[in-house]
Amino acid sequence: MAGHVTAGFAVCVSGFFYLERPFCYGAKELYLVVNFVLLVLLFVCMIYDLKDREVPMPLTLGGLVGAGVLGLFHGLWSPVLLTIALTHVADFNPREKRLAFALTLSAFAGIFQPDAALLCAVILSIWMLWEFGIMGGADVKLLIAITIMIGNATILIPIAVAGGIQGVIASLRKQREIPFVVSIFCGALFFVLFPLI
C-alpha cells in the first residue's frame, strides 16, 4: 500500500492533493497546457509589439524563466544553463571575449548533454543574432524560450517561413521596421495546430 502512495505521489508532481484517485496530468495534457500557455504569451507579446513596437520586459523574461523551469522539468538542464550563462556573457567586453566565451560555453553544453547539443547550437545561433544586432532582445528571449519550452528546434522552421513572408510583404509596402513577434506567433501557432489537423 505504501508503494502505491509513493508511486502516486511521484507521478502526481503537478501539485494536486492526493485523494481517492489523484488527478495528474499525463504527457498529452501537459503538452496541451504548455502549448496553450505559450500561445497566450506570444499573442499578448504580439499585441504589444504591434501597438507599441516594444514588448515589456516582464513578459519576455517571465516567458524565459517559465521555459527554463519547464526545461529543467523535462531534463533539458544543459540548454537552460547555457541560456543563463549567455545572459551573463552578454555583459563582457570586448566583443571578441564575449564570442569566445559564448562558443566555449556552447561547446561544453553540447558535450555534457549530447541529446541537447542541437538545442544548444540553436540557442547560441539565436544569441548571435542579438549579438550582431540583427534581432532585438525581446525577439531573442521569446525564440529561446520557445525552443526550450517545446524542446524541438524544428519549431523555428515555420517561424522563419512566417518571417520571410512578413519580410516580403514589408518590403513591398516599403516598411523599414517589422514587428517580428507576429511571425513568431504565427509560426508557433502553425507548429502547434498542424499536428491536430
Write out the residue ranges for each language-model feature.
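A membrane-topology feature that recognizes alpha-helical transmembrane segments
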Residues: 1-197
